[in-house]
Design a protein with these regions (language model features):
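Well-ordered beta-strand positions
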Residues: 6, 35-36, 90, 117-119
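Edge beta-strand at a domain terminus
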Residues: 113-149
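Central antiparallel beta-sheet cores of small beta-barrel/beta-sandwich binding domains
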Residues: 14-15, 19-112, 147
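Charge-rich amphipathic alpha-helical interaction elements
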Residues: 2, 20, 88, 118-121, ...
Length: 149
């Protein structure tokens, strides 16, 4: 069973929880749109909203390239809170793992990681976190579900 997230164009919904350091769990919802414009380049746009909180939405705009081995990819990301980001991802048998780091003069040395565990062809379980140096600042866990075309 091949991965469908990232590797196929489509729309996905996100529902889960966000946790800030020293904060309570808050509900997060969102949507991701993945498109492929050439055989090895993809674009992905994600919008996360926090319906029960007075917190700004998070917008993520990716541009990535799948390596010739079709098991690794690299990406550039514009993150509405963190700025310009560079990252890499690995496509495992049952999961997609990626890490990223903030570009430029980032005195906080922010970086992050994400894992998407495939539940079935239409659903993934997402976990990820954002770090400053070696300290975890926030984490998110959510179910990502493909929407019909």
């Amino acid at each position: 069973m091949a991965h469908t997230f990232i590797l196929e164009s489509g729309q996905w919904t996100i529902e889960g929880n966000w946790l800030e350091r020293n904060g309570m769990l808050i509900t997060v919802k969102g949507k991701t749109i993945v498109t492929w414009d050439r055989t090895d380049w993809f674009s992905m746009v994600t919008k996360l909203i926090f319906p029960s909180q007075d917190r700004e939405d998070i917008i993520l705009q990716y541009r990535g390239r799948l390596d010739s081995d079709e098991r690794h990819y690299t990406f550039l990301l514009q993150h509405s809170e963190l700025g310009k980001i560079e990252g890499e991802g690995w496509l495992g048998i049952n999961s997609i793992i990626q890490r990223y780091w903030v570009l430029g003069n980032d005195v906080q040395r922010r970086s992050g990681f994400e894992t998407l565990l495939r539940l079935d062809q239409e659903r993934y379980y997402f976990t990820g976190g954002i770090l400053s140096g070696v300290s975890l600042n926030s984490a998110m866990e959510a179910t990502i579900e493909r929407q019909p075309d």
